[in-house]
């Protein structure tokens, strides 16, 4: 099948042309191809399927439940909404609960049900966090960095654990980072660290910052904190929740200037994503969704109720150049979980996961493996 007459997102920009789909993969991207059955895109934009490397749940299901049926439901919702690959994030919970969830992820990765987003990784969000900046994490299960516990979970995930989070100020964080970064990306998260403490962990091998601005100190001219330490290291990529509630539009634009080509848009979506207002749970705590905002009973903002596609569109609406917004939701997150050669781009040989959209990025159609959903 040939797709012609579109604006194809290749190499960080939109280029007039087309591509073929052969055996579920891209072929002849922006190149001439033999005549055959074709689709006229009529000038529509085509972007890669999105990659969400930090999503907890949707449709009433949560990754940490460890329920296979729920994970399938999550993956189907994501695919329908233009997110064709994902790495679900766990919560701060007992190790045996996390191990069950990770083994469930391995099962979905292997089976790869038709019509579902591809599970290509896991983000281990917790339990190595600061109590002061725990946010919506359950304080009862917070722990100091423990490489042996991490290794147990890494083995349970059979190579799928791609991001592990840690608060730099905790005892043992630097040594943990040195060892864990040999196996996966280490991210600074849920932290009250000083600039110096954060810098030590980045210099030990951390290359990621979980949900920039949230659950960490803000920038102060005498105390630049983890944001200052991260921004001046070109090896560090920063996640950003762009649901319109977690981060002000001005701070969204600032992030793209502080971290050029190093912003990774995420949803941080909870099980209430795609659901009506009401009461839900997160890591053993009640969460209340009202007007698109999810909060704990004490008013603390929890994760989001938005999917990544909506977050990408929000970024563009807030003034981020469209090309940068698309990169931040596709190629950059794919890179962060070590899957740049498998997803996140429109290139010969990669799975034909793509979204047909208009100039405002409004979806017209989603294709997974070259098949329209």
Segments from the language model and where they lie:
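N-terminal metal-binding scaffold of metallo-dependent hydrolase/deaminase domains
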Residues: 1-33, 360, 367, 372
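Alpha-helical scaffold segments that flank or form the walls of functional sites
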Residues: 45, 53, 63-117, 141-156, ...
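Active-site core of metal-dependent hydrolases
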Residues: 155-275
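C-terminal cap of metal-dependent C-N hydrolases
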Residues: 6, 335, 345-373
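His/Asp/Glu-enriched, well-ordered alpha-helical/loop segment
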Residues: 228-238, 256-267, 272-356
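Active-site gating loops and adjacent loop-to-helix segments of metal-dependent hydrolytic enzymes
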Residues: 76-87, 130-158, 200-212, 223, ...
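Divalent metal-dependent hydrolysis catalytic cores, especially in the metallo-beta-lactamase
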Residues: 56, 72-101, 117-130, 157-169, ...
């Amino acid at each position: 099948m040939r797709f012609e007459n579109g604006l194809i997102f290749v190499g960080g920009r939109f280029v007039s042309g087309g591509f073929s789909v052969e055996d579920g993969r891209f072929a002849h991207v922006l190149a001439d191809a033999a005549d055959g059955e074709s689709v006229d895109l009529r000038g529509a934009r085509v972007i890669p399927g999105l990659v969400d490397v930090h999503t907890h749940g949707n449709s009433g299901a949560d990754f940490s439940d460890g329920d296979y049926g729920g994970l399938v439901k999550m993956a189907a919702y994501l695919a329908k909404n233009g997110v064709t690959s994902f790495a679900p994030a766990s919560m701060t919970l007992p190790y045996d609960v996390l191990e069950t969830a990770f083994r469930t992820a391995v099962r979905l990765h292997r089976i790869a049900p038709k019509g579902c987003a591809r599970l290509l990784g896991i983000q281990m969000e917790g339990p190595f966090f600061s109590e002061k900046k725990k946010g919506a994490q359950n304080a009862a299960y917070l722990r100091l960095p423990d490489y042996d516990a991490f290794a147990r979970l890494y083995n349970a995930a059979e190579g799928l654990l791609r991001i592990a989070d840690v608060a730099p100020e905790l005892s043992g964080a630097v040594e943990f980072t040195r060892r864990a970064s040999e196996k996966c990306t280490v991210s600074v998260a849920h932290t009250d660290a000083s600039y110096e403490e954060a810098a030590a962990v980045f210099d030990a091998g951390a290359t990621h910052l979980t949900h920039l601005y949230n659950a960490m100190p803000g920038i102060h001219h005498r105390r630049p904190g983890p944001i200052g330490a991260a921004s001046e290291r070109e090896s560090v990529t920063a996640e950003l929740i762009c649901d319109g509630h977690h981060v002000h539009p001005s701070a969204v634009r600032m992030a793209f200037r502080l971290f050029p080509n190093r912003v990774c848009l995420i949803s941080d979506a909870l099980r209430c994503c795609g659901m009506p207002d009401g009461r839900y749970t997160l890591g053993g705590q009640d969460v209340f969704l009202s007007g698109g905002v999810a909060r704990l009973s004490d008013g603390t903002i929890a994760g989001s109720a938005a999917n990544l596609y909506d977050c990408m569109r929000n970024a563009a609406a807030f003034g981020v150049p469209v090309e940068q917004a698309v990169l931040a939701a596709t190629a950059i997150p794919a890179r962060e979980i070590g899957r740049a050669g498998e997803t996140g781009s429109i290139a010969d040989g990669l799975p034909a996961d793509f979204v047909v959209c208009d100039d405002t990025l409004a979806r017209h159609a989603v294709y997974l493996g070259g098949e329209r959903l």
